[in-house]
A protein has these predicted regions:
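Conserved NTP-donor binding/palm subdomain of two-metal-ion nucleotidyltransferases/polymerases, i.e.
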Residues: 2-125, 130-253, 332-445
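Intrinsic disorder/low-complexity segments
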Residues: 201, 250-332
Length: 445
């Protein structure tokens, strides 16, 4: 059974305060060990997000030493500068590929940052850019520029841009179970056109393509799942998904027939509603306004908490019965499609675990969940998050060293731990790893 430490619980309370609209200060902050909270924030790559929370606190509640406060502030300012640099890199790399005849889409990263109330508080990573084309064509093109780049099943390395690492994807993500992965790749092929054409502005710095929110609901869940199966995940990835869910309900605001009681199942329940019971009579989705959100100067700026990087169709001004019915219908249809995909991909129980975390850690209301929360799976995944941290870099259970043999032994050990919850993926992992070895030989330079 998972035991959450007192400081972790205080951290969760403060995280909800930092990201939420409520101004009520958590009473648990009186017992906060600010050094411990800072260490957890570093481990989970949430330093900037929590500093936004600190700025909301009255001075008497910030019971940390001046040195720690200045350190926290300095790191937060560095994140702002890093995000400006990543924005520029994402724009320039996208434009470079466009001039070479490739359409692109920026995955996660700076597209996710646009969904945050303060896009410059998110801890940035590298640039993951999905380049249109089959793997063989994209790999050949990249190696014509940089001959020694290593390729794996879904991406290939690329020369860094002004110190920013770049990964070129020909597949957005993958699953270890061959059957589920085949369905996932078909899904990506089916919806790719909308992703490459969904363009937004990054402040005033320039324009990029990012995925639609419907795509992100599927893609980013598979990304989180892949990290869980392979190395570990952190709260940053889960906070990204929190904002994806918020974004989904901003697109389809005031339009869901889902009631909170639908998702208040008994502990450990894995049952799910029949999507047909949620289906409306129409299939037309609400229209998106293409005019993107713009900051004033291309740098850190105040962004409306209701914005998600681009303007949305306003439902507020039209309360007519016809309008409400049409949008409710389209929202139900969109949710039905997401739920069907999750079942097809074998991700229903995992999604339920993530929804449990969305409620327990981030304070998301039941009406915004896309599947029923699953407490059993949620507690297991949350324990993995707290143990491993971002990308599993802080996992004390990594006991086999950093050699290639140690890495493979660690994978087997991880598979054994995960097989009880995710048997298809865990049992397929050694088979996929063997198949992937020969795939890499085929594409080895």
């Amino acid at each position: 059974m998972m035991i959450v430490s007192k400081q972790h619980q205080i951290f969760f309370d403060f995280l909800r305060f930092s990201i939420g609209p409520k101004s009520e200060i958590p009473s648990s902050l009186k017992e906060a060990d600010w050094k411990a909270l800072y260490r957890i924030a570093q481990k989970q790559c949430l330093v900037g997000v929590l500093f936004d929370g600190i700025k909301k606190l009255p001075a008497e509640y910030v019971g940390m030493k001046k040195e720690l406060l200045l350190q926290w502030m300095a790191e937060s300012q560095m994140l702002e500068k890093a995000n400006v640099r990543l924005n520029d890199a994402a724009i320039q790399v996208s434009e470079w590929f466009r001039k070479k005849g490739f359409r692109t889409c920026i995955l996660k990263g700076q597209g996710n940052a646009l969904m945050y109330p303060n896009p410059y508080s998110r801890t940035p990573g590298d640039i993951d850019i999905w380049v249109e084309g089959e793997d063989k064509r994209v790999i050949s093109f990249v190696r014509s520029i940089s001959p020694h780049e290593k390729a794996c099943y879904h991406h290939i390395g690329f020369p860094s841009y002004k110190g920013v690492e770049v990964e070129v994807h020909y597949r957005p993500s993958f699953l270890l179970c061959f059957w589920h992965n085949r369905k996932l790749q078909k899904y990506y092929e089916r919806v790719k056109e909308e992703q490459f054409s969904h363009r937004v502005m990054l402040g005033k710095q320039g324009e990029i393509a990012i995925p639609t929110v419907e795509f992100n609901l599927i893609f980013q869940l598979t990304h989180i799942f892949s990290h869980l199966m392979n190395e570990g995940i952190g709260l940053r990835q889960l906070l990204d998904y929190y904002y994806v869910l918020c974004d989904f309900y901003k697109v389809y605001q005031k339009s869901s027939k889902i009631t909170p009681s639908l998702f208040t199942l008994k502990e450990g329940s894995t049952s799910h509603p029949d999507p047909l019971t949620l289906r409306g009579e129409g299939g037309n989705r609400p229209i998106r306004c293409s005019e993107p959100l713009r900051s004033k100067d291309g740098g850190p700026s105040k962004v409306s908490p209701d914005s998600a990087g681009w303007d949305r169709l306003s439902i507020e001004g039209d309360n007519s019965a016809g309008s409400t019915t049409a949008v409710t219908s389209s929202a139900s249809t969109a949710l039905d499609e997401v739920q069907e995909e999750l079942k097809e991909l074998g991700l229903w129980k995992f999604a339920g675990g993530i929804m449990y975390i969305m409620q327990e850690v981030f304070g998301m209301s039941a009406s915004r969940l896309i599947v029923p929360p699953n407490e059993k799976y949620g507690k297991f995944v949350l324990n993995e998050v707290l143990e491993a941290g971002n990308f599993g870099r802080h996992d004390a259970r990594n006991r086999f060293g950093r050699s290639q043999l140690g890495h493979n032994l660690q994978r087997v050990y991880r598979d054994i731990r995960l097989v009880r919850y995710f048997p298809a993926e865990a049992l397929c992992e050694p088979l996929f790893r063997t198949w992937h070895f020969f795939w890499r030989l085929k594409y080895k330079k």
